[in-house]
C-alpha cells in the first residue's frame, strides 16, 4: 500500500507591487495606520492576469519534469474565479495538457487550500497517482478601493503543491475541517441579487467584513481546530516544527501563538510583502519556505486556514 505525500510546492505572484504609501494616494490611510493594524506593507496586484493565469503558472512549475497525462486530479481553491463556469481547474487542465485529470474548483474562502488538500488526499487512491492542489486568487477585482477597512488587506497570487501517492508511510496524519454558517454575515464578497426576468446582469458586491468579529473568531476557533487535529494524530504541540497559517493579519497569528503558548518563531509570516491572498496564502508561504530551506522533508507541519463561511481548518502533514 502507498500513501499520499506533498512532493513539490510552488508559487506565483504578479509583478506589480502596491505599497501602503501608494494606497494613501487614493484613499484616506497611511503606511503607519495599515502596518500597526495588519502587519502589511505591500501587496501584489494583477494587471492583465486573471485567476486562471496565476494558477496555470503554478501548475507548470509543479509539473516540470512530470508527465501531465499522469495527473489524476486538479483542484483549484478560489473565491475569485475567472467565471462561474468553466471551473478554473478546467482551464488549468487545458493549459498543461493533463487530459486524464478530473477537475473542479473548491470554494471555502481563506480555508480553501487546506480544505482542497484534505479532499485531494482522500481522493487520490491510485498508486503512483498525482494531484495538483492550487490556491489562486485575484481578490483585487472584488475590492472596493474606497473602503480602507478592506482594500488595504488583500493581494493577488497563487501557490500550490503536487501530491503524489507513492509514499511507503502516511504523510497526511490528521485533519479538521469546520464550518460555522451562522456567522456567515461577518465576511462576504461577490453576492448577486435575484433579478426578475428579463432583468439585467448585476455587478458583484465587493468585500464586506466585520473585522472585530472575524478577529475574535480566528483567535478562538483556530487554536481549537489545531488542538483537535493534533489530538486526533496523537501529536503534541511541541513536536510540530512549523505552523503555516492563512496570512490574514499579523496580529491574529501572534495571538494564536500566544493562546497555544508557543514561540512566534514557529509561525513564519510573509503577510508584510503579499497581504491577504486568501486561499493562496498558505501555499505561497510553504513554497517560499521550501525555497529558502526553512521547510524541509521530514518536517512536521500544521497548515491552518480560517475565513468566509465562516470556516476554519487544520491539516497535520509530514513533509
Curated annotation (Swiss-Prot):
GO terms for molecular function: 3-oxoacyl-[acyl-carrier-protein] synthase activity; beta-ketoacyl-acyl-carrier-protein synthase III activity. Pfam families: ACP_syn_III, ACP_syn_III_C. The keyword DNA-binding does not apply. The active site is at residues 110, 246, 276. Keywords: Acyltransferase, Cytoplasm, Fatty acid biosynthesis, Fatty acid metabolism, Lipid biosynthesis, Lipid metabolism, Multifunctional enzyme, Transferase. GO terms for cellular component: cytoplasm. Pathway: Lipid metabolism; fatty acid biosynthesis. It is found in: Cytoplasm. InterPro entries: ACP_syn_III_C (IPR013747), ACP_syn_III_N (IPR013751), FabH (IPR004655), Thiolase-like (IPR016039). Residues 247-251 are annotated as: ACP-binding. Its EC number is 2.3.1.180. GO terms for biological process: fatty acid biosynthetic process. It catalyses: malonyl-[ACP] + acetyl-CoA + H(+) = 3-oxobutanoyl-[ACP] + CO2 + CoA. It comes from the Bacteria. The keyword Acyltransferase applies. It is an enzyme of class 2 (transferase). Belongs to the thiolase-like superfamily. FabH family. Homodimer. Catalyzes the condensation reaction of fatty acid synthesis by the addition to an acyl acceptor of two carbons from malonyl-ACP. Catalyzes the first condensation reaction which initiates fatty acid synthesis and may therefore play a role in governing the total rate of fatty acid production. Possesses both acetoacetyl-ACP synthase and acetyl transacylase activities. Its substrate specificity determines the biosynthesis of branched-chain and/or straight-chain of fatty acids. The last Arg residue of the ACP-binding site is essential for the weak association between ACP/AcpP and FabH. This is Beta-ketoacyl-[acyl-carrier-protein] synthase III. It comes from Lactobacillus delbrueckii subsp. bulgaricus (strain ATCC BAA-365 / Lb-18). The lineage of its organism: Bacteria, Bacillati, Bacillota, Bacilli, Lactobacillales. The gene is fabH.
